[in-house]
Design a protein with these regions (language model features):
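Short acidic/polar segment at the start of the alpha1 helix of CheY-like receiver
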Residues: 11-15
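Acidic, metal-coordinating helix/loop segments flanking the phosphotransfer/catalytic sites
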Residues: 6, 31-49
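Charged docking surfaces used in two-component/phosphorelay signaling
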Residues: 16-24
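A generic structural motif
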Residues: 25-29
């Protein structure tokens, strides 16, 4: 079972790099580009970790 990580980052280049690395390591990654979306994703997905 993959661990879920929510990445909160407004810079799309940085968030893409983080997603690529974590995907390769077997994590299920969700990206939120602002605080409002981060709260929505957190409540919906209940991630194991928020970065």
């Amino acid at each position: 079972m993959a661990r879920n990580i929510l990445v909160v980052e407004d810079d799309r280049n940085i968030s893409d790099l983080i997603r690529m690395y974590l995907d390769k390591e077997g994590f299920d990654v969700r990206i939120a580009y602002d605080g409002g979306k981060a709260v929505e994703e957190f409540e919906k997905q209940k991630p194991d970790l928020v970065l």
